[in-house]
Amino acid sequence: AIILLAVYRPNLLKITPNQWKIVIPSGLSLGAMNLIFYLAIERIPIGLAVTLEFIGPLVVAVIGSKRLIDYLWVLLAAIGIVLIAPWSNNGIDLLGVLFALLAGALWAAYIVLGTKVSKIMKGGDAVATGMLFASILIVPFGILENGLTNLTPTFLYLGIALALLSSAIPFTLEMKALAQLPARTFSILMSVEPAAASIFAFIFLQEYLTFNEILAVVFVVIASVGSTIT
């Protein structure tokens, strides 16, 4: 939030009541989504958490669909999600699953609200203001968890890098995308996330892809490309 506010410098005094009514819930849904997702990956594998979370955007895609061809891309994305999820793990933490599904519901809310915000506010202003309210929601939990004991130079450097790579840059780009794309198309394009999570897990964590996981990557890529060209 600090980085985005410094870069875009939104004039909070000029934000209208109608804009506040949308940007505040958008920011809160964003903050809650991130907080609950991290609670999920404390309990279940990242690939499963991302897969379950994507059910939210997938629901948005289905609800916003009006053509038969749209359901084909949603179906392909759904098949990819099912294939990529480690359903064979019998020791899955049910609370972790619940957290991931709740994060998905909040993600769906963020997509819908973000689409509305992008139509009435500049992208940078919307992201910076929304992230401000997201931080207002999340920071108290961090303070209650460990106080200020973790505020070492190394921790702060890593925190800044994480803030840029996981929030500031991605959500700025997402807001620009939401301004140009229907919520349905945006939701299907986001289906690359489960595939990306598995690929990065393979690269950085040496988690090898099975045949089903490779097939899942193919399905979600086809769904993403198909949704943009039809």
Tell where the protein language model's regions lie, with residue ranges.
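Specific alpha-helical transmembrane segments that line the substrate/conduction pathway
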Residues: Y38-L68, A103, R184-F202
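Hydrophobic/aromatic residues within transmembrane alpha-helices
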Residues: A40, P45, G64-R67, V117, ...
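Juxtamembrane helix-loop boundary signature in multi-pass membrane transporters
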Residues: F54-A105, K119, I143, V217-T230
